[in-house]
Design a protein with these regions (language model features):
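Axial heme c-ligation environment in periplasmic c-type cytochrome domains
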Residues: 49-62, 76-102, 158-163, 186-213
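Sequence/structural segment immediately N-terminal to covalent heme-attachment motifs in c-type
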Residues: 4-30, 35-43, 129-158, 165-183
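Sec-exported extracytoplasmic/periplasmic mature domains
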Residues: 17-21, 27, 75-79, 97, ...
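An amphipathic alpha-helix signature
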Residues: 67-71, 75, 105-108, 174, ...
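An acidic site on a long C-lobe helix of protein kinase domains
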Residues: 8, 18-21, 66, 100-103, ...
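Active-site substrate-binding loop specific to GH73 endo-beta-N-acetylglucosaminidase modules
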Residues: 27-81
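Flexible internal linker/loop segments at domain or repeat junctions
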Residues: 121-134, 155-157, 187-192, 196
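Post-cleavage N-terminal segment of exported redox proteins
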Residues: 1-6, 47-52, 68-135
Length: 213
């Protein structure tokens, strides 16, 4: 325990660093497969999924998420920014959705106090994009994605996650985004959100170049 921190923070640290072992996915690994402690909880690729940065970065981290947003996501699998998918959906279904509200807010308090890391799963620099590729991507998005996620990518929070400003979309590692496009996604039922939502797979109809665009 850190005597300089609150009881809530210390409880959150225990749940995140110990019992919850969040770093197993969200901390990058070195060449030997061990955690890169200098980048703890700032994004990692594991089992062909990219677990995003949990730090305060506004582009790729949780900088825009409030403590209540974090608690809601862990309890229900959804919030106004994102829906849990992949391995994280199992974490929510079998673990965090069972926690007390006090424990969920303790986790949130700890995560909101994480230090900034310049390069975790992404950076603050908006990447340059070829104009022709961007134009093609816009057309494909309009045909295949806009009906649910909106023409401007704003989505319908807690149902169809917004893609504009989405920290998963803005990671420098696109693994999760590409995988969801190819394979689709399905949210998990929780007590608070008992009806799961699903996104269809597009791997059968889009080429690699179209997915990249």
């Amino acid at each position: 325990p850190d005597p300089k921190k609150s009881q809530q923070w210390n409880r959150g640290a225990y749940l995140v660093e110990g019992l919850g072992h969040c770093g197993a996915c969200h901390t990058p690994k070195n060449f030997a497969g061990a955690d890169d402690s200098g980048s703890a909880l700032h994004g990692g690729n594991l089992q062909s999924w990219f677990a995003p940065d949990l730090g305060p970065d506004l582009r790729v981290g949780l900088g825009h998420w409030s403590a209540d947003d974090i608690a809601e996501y862990l309890k229900t699998g959804r919030n106004r920014f994102s829906n849990a998918t992949g391995p994280m959906s199992e974490v929510v279904q079998y673990s965090t959705s069972k926690l007390t509200d006090d424990d969920l807010h303790a986790i949130a308090a700890y995560l909101k106090d994480l230090p900034t890391k310049g390069q975790g799963g992404g950076d603050n620099t908006k990447p340059s994009v070829d104009a022709n590729v961007a134009s093609a991507g816009k057309a494909i998005f309009g045909d295949q994605c806009a009906e649910c996620h909106g023409a401007d990518g704003s989505g319908e929070p807690t149902f169809f996650p917004p893609l504009k400003g989405n920290n998963n979309v803005q990671q420098s590692d696109p693994t999760t985004v590409v995988r969801v496009i190819l394979e689709g996604a399905r949210s998990v039922p929780t007590k608070a959100r008992p009806t799961p939502l699903s996104m269809p797979a597009f791997g059968w109809k889009l080429t690699d170049a179209q997915v990249a665009a």
